[in-house]
Swiss-Prot record:
Record's subcellular location: Cytoplasm
GO biological process entries: mitotic spindle organization
Keyword Cytoplasm carried by entry: yes
Protein name as catalogued: Serine/threonine-protein phosphatase 2A activator 2
Lineage of producing organism: Eukaryota, Fungi, Dikarya, Ascomycota, Pezizomycotina
Bias (Pro residues) ranges: 1-10, 45-59
Superkingdom in the source lineage: Eukaryota
């Protein structure tokens, strides 16, 4: 018998028969094709990283060389523009960047005492004696004031009196040369009239070292010790001076500045950490890393010092710019950023460079203005703008575009006064931190 298929049920009236399978649309074809999302590249900095110019050969000063007492020559924006395109600007840039490149991936301890030349040892001894002068000019009692202590002027007077003998020890015998170098050296510890200190004074110290190079006393073989021993010792001396005399920040940008006083520790420090295998930019938020490596790397050491001088805990509250920079992917990006900042925020800022001093070893362009004697030497104690070019400027004391920045008391003073009153149990936390 042949089997028969079961009878199909009859379609109900008014109900359509099911459509054939071939007529059902493939909804998969109607869905948009999934493609990998293209990640947006971060905003690139249109400003190229400044290159290191070639460092010129030192001039022959053995005969027929006329030394000059350094003076201000950047008295207007026009003078500043001339400076920025001058050989001297390239000389300063080559000097600072050349020193930075000499310490790539090199910690402070890499330079041993046995590696130091006699001149480097003498310079370190001079800095030791400078620190000892602090005890001979103790700070005046100011009743808890956070503004600069006038006893600082006594320290600078003592440094000036010792300067000639110190330069004889270095090997500078010409009295005119000593006068030129002493001006840079004494101006590297701060301004006596305003009782302040900033990146311009720090730059004066580097120019003093540049003058020693121009005289043929310092050699390129001394570059590493110059940064890792001499400059590091200078930082230590300046921290003692800042904490003793409550030096006011020169042209401070407040919390929106990189640091109240220093810049070069960050530039040199980023170069030291350029290819470090495990210390990343985020490490500045790790107290143990700062404690263990702060003495080896200037960047970490400066962050640690900044933390110790604040009354509030947390970089994002007291140093938001440092906090922002720590999000960079690598030290290479930070190194490039610090180079840009040196050119733009130090050499490129008139409020900083109007105090720059030009002599014979670091000369001014002939077309720049001559100093009429109304510079820092003629500053009036109660007038922080004395001797400055105010043509076309609105000096209302606000914002970053004014001549001298924002005049603020020392943050170091606040921390030191709290310690004197026994309030050093720990830093305050922001309530919503």
């Amino acid at each position: 018998m042949t089997s028969q298929a079961p009878p199909q049920p009859a379609s109900s009236p008014g109900v359509a028969a099911p459509a054939a399978a071939s007529s059902i649309p493939n909804l998969k074809d109607r869905l948009p094709k999934l493609e990998p999302r293209k990640r947006r590249s971060g905003p690139s900095n249109p400003t190229p990283i400044p290159e290191t110019p070639a460092l010129p050969t030192p001039p022959d000063t053995s005969s027929n060389w006329t030394f000059k007492t350094p003076s201000r020559r950047i008295l207007s924006k026009k003078d500043h523009d001339i400076f920025l395109s001058s050989p001297t600007c390239k000389l300063v840039t080559a000097w600072v960047f050349g020193l930075a490149e000499s310490i790539v991936d090199t910690p402070n301890s890499a330079i041993r005492d046995a590696d130091l030349s006699a001149l480097i040892k003498t310079i370190l001894h001079i800095l030791d004696e400078t620190e000892q002068l602090v005890t001979k000019s103790p700070p005046n009692e100011q009743g808890g004031s956070r503004f600069g202590n006038k006893a600082f002027r006594g320290l600078l007077d003592l440094a000036q009196k010792n300067s000639a003998a110190w330069h004889h020890d270095i090997g500078v015998q010409n009295e005119d040369a000593i006068n030129e170098l002493s001006t840079y050296f004494c101006e590297s510890f701060g301004n006596a009239n305003r009782i302040d200190y900033g990146s311009g004074h720090e730059l004066n110290f580097m120019i003093w070292l540049l003058c020693l190079y121009q005289l043929g006393l310092l050699k390129q073989s001394d570059f590493k010790p110059i940064v890792l021993r001499v400059f590091v010792r200078y930082l230590e001396v300046m921290r003692v001076i800042q904490m003793t005399y409550y030096l006011e920040p020169a042209g401070s940008h407040g919390v929106w500045g990189l640091d109240d006083y220093q810049f070069l520790p960050f530039l040199f420090g980023a170069t030291q950490l350029l290819h470090h295998p495990y210390i990343t930019p985020r490490a500045i938020h790790q107290d143990l890393t700062l404690e263990e490596f702060g003495h080896e790397y200037m960047y970490l050491g400066q962050v640690s010092f900044v933390n110790s001088t604040k009354t509030v805990k947390g970089l994002r509250w007291h140093s938001p710019m440092l906090d922002d920079i720590s999000s960079a992917r690598s030290w290479t990006k930070i190194d490039g950023g610090m180079r840009r900042m040196f050119v733009a925020e130090v050499l490129g800022k008139l409020p900083v460079m109007q105090h720059f001093l030009f002599g014979s070893l670091v000369p001014a362009d002939d077309s720049m203005s001559e100093d009429t004697g109304a510079g820092d030497e003629a500053d009036v104690e109660d007038d922080p703008h004395a001797g400055h070019d105010h043509t076309g400027k609105a000096h209302d004391g606000t914002g970053w575009g004014d001549c001298c920045g924002i005049k603020v008391p020392s943050s170091i003073a606040a921390a030191q006064e709290m310690k004197k009153r026994g309030m050093n149990q720990g830093l305050r936390r922001i309530p919503f931190d």
